[in-house]
Amino acid sequence: MRSLSEIIAPSSYWTLAGTIGLNTNIFEINLINLILVLGILFYYGKGVLINLLENRERTILNTIQDAEERHKEATEKLQRARLRLQQAEMKADEIRIIGLTKMDRERRDLVDAADNDLRELEESKNYAIRFEKQRAIEQVRQQVSRLASERAFESLNGRLTNEFQLRMIDYHIGLLRAMANKST
């Protein structure tokens, strides 16, 4: 049976281990060479690895700080945008209220103007009616006066005799003389 040392490293490899050197054949590497290589890598690679990790840590921290600053700026911009939105909504409400007020005022002015026009039309109509009424009354008066004059002339012509005409002429001549004497 074989010993444990022969299982781990056969006796053919012990001769190579006796000489100090590095076996580059990966299939022929024994445990000591492997530990030696790992130790050297660990000893010299530790500083490089630490530097890489520190650089990576700084990069991550800087990235986090930049992200936090961008988040803060974005939050501030969002707050400003919300404030502007709120102001815009207030301004829109104000404009809407002003528009509704103007519309209501214009509607009232239009209704008032229509009422005034209607009132003026009514007054004009009433004036025209009164004018036509006065004209009709005047025409009726003229007709009544004409008819009365015609009847009076007919009546006078029927009653007028020569003797009555002479008396009337004498009476009026007397009146004219009396007026002439008063004026002189």
Swiss-Prot record:
GO terms for molecular function: ATP binding; proton-transporting ATP synthase activity, rotational mechanism. One of its GO terms (cellular component) is proton-transporting ATP synthase complex. Keywords: ATP synthesis, ATP-binding, CF(0), Chloroplast, Hydrogen ion transport, Ion transport, Membrane, Nucleotide-binding, Plastid, Thylakoid, Transmembrane, Transmembrane helix, Transport. It is a single-pass membrane protein. The keyword Transmembrane helix applies. Its main location: plastid. The chain crosses the membrane at residues 29-49. It is found in: Plastid, Chloroplast thylakoid membrane. The keyword Protease does not apply. InterPro entries: ATP_synth_b/b'su_bac/chlpt. F(1)F(0) ATP synthase produces ATP from ADP in the presence of a proton or sodium gradient. F-type ATPases consist of two structural domains, F(1) containing the extramembraneous catalytic core and F(0) containing the membrane proton channel, linked together by a central stalk and a peripheral stalk. During catalysis, ATP synthesis in the catalytic domain of F(1) is coupled via a rotary mechanism of the central stalk subunits to proton translocation. Component of the F(0) channel, it forms part of the peripheral stalk, linking F(1) to F(0). PANTHER family: ATP SYNTHASE SUBUNIT B, CHLOROPLASTIC. In plastids the F-type ATPase is also known as CF(1)CF(0). Belongs to the ATPase B chain family. F-type ATPases have 2 components, F(1) - the catalytic core - and F(0) - the membrane proton channel. F(1) has five subunits: alpha(3), beta(3), gamma(1), delta(1), epsilon(1). F(0) has four main subunits: a(1), b(1), b'(1) and c(10-14). The alpha and beta chains form an alternating ring which encloses part of the gamma chain. F(1) is attached to F(0) by a central stalk formed by the gamma and epsilon chains, while a peripheral stalk is formed by the delta, b and b' chains. This is ATP synthase subunit b, chloroplastic. The lineage of its organism: Eukaryota, Viridiplantae, Streptophyta, Embryophyta, Tracheophyta. The gene is atpF.
